[in-house]
C-alpha cells in the first residue's frame, strides 16, 4: 500500500526525468549529431537555472569560453524536452558544467550546438519539445508547453501567476490522456513513467 500511494502521488503530476541512456535512434529523432558527457562541478557563486550567467561569471574569474548546447529530460517516455544550456570550455578544450542542479550530478549528457546563440532572448535560453509518439493529445499538451516557454522568453523570465494558472488548467484537462499514453508506452524494464528513477515493474506497473 505504501509503494502504491507514493507512486499515485507522483503520477498525479508526471515529472520530467533524466534518461539513463539516449539511444542512437533517439538522438537521430532529436536531430543530435554529437552527445558527450560533461563533468558537473558547480561553482561556489553559481545559481540554479542561471547557466549562462554562471558560465560568464566563471570565465571572468578563471578564463575559458562559453559552449552552448542542449541537455535532455523525458516526460512519461513519450516526449523529450531539450533545454538549451551553457557550459565552460576550458583552455584545453575540455568542458565543465558549473551550474548546480539537484537532479544532475557527476556527468551531464550534453549536445554541443553553437546555433543556440541565435535563439537566446535577453540571456534567457529556450527549450524545444519533441513528441516520441504520434498522438493528438500529446501534440496539444506540447503546444501548451511551447506557448508557456515562449511567454517566458518574451517576458524576460517573469510570467504572471494568473498566466501560469491558465496554462496549468489547460494542461490538466489533457492530463488523463497523457498519463494513459505514458502507461501504454512504458515497458516493464523501462524507467518508470512517473519519474521515480525505478524500473516500471518495481514502481507503478
Residue ranges and their predicted role:
Residues 205:
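Phosphate-coordinating loops and pocket residues in cytosolic domains that bind phosphorylated ligands
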Residues 1-193, 198-202:
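A structural boundary/capping signal
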Amino acid at each position: 500500500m505504501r509503494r502504491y500511494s507514493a507512486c499515485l502521488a507522483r503520477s498525479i503530476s508526471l515529472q520530467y526525468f533524466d534518461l539513463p541512456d539516449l539511444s542512437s535512434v533517439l538522438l537521430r529523432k532529436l536531430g543530435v549529431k554529437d552527445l558527450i558527457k560533461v563533468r558537473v562541478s558547480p561553482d561556489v557563486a553559481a545559481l540554479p537555472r542561471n547557466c549562462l550567467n554562471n558560465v560568464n561569471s566563471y570565465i571572468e574569474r578563471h578564463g575559458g569560453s562559453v559552449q552552448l548546447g542542449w541537455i535532455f529530460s523525458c516526460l512519461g517516455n513519450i516526449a523529450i524536452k531539450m533545454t538549451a544550456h551553457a557550459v565552460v570550455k576550458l583552455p584545453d578544450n575540455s568542458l565543465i558544467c558549473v551550474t548546480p542542479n539537484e537532479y544532475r550530478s557527476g556527468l551531464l549528457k550534453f549536445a554541443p550546438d553553437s546555433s543556440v546563440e541565435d535563439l537566446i532572448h535577453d540571456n534567457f535560453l529556450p527549450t524545444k519539445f519533441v513528441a516520441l509518439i504520434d498522438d493528438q493529445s500529446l501534440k496539444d499538451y506540447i503546444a501548451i508547453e511551447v506557448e508557456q516557454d515562449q511567454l517566458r522568453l518574451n517576458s524576460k523570465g517573469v510570467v504572471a501567476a494568473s498566466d501560469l494558472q491558465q496554462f496549468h488548467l489547460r494542461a490538466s484537462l489533457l492530463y488523463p490522456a497523457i498519463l494513459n499514453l505514458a502507461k501504454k508506452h512504458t515497458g516493464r524494464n523501462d524507467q518508470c513513467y512517473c519519474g521515480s528513477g525505478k524500473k516500471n515493474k518495481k514502481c507503478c506497473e
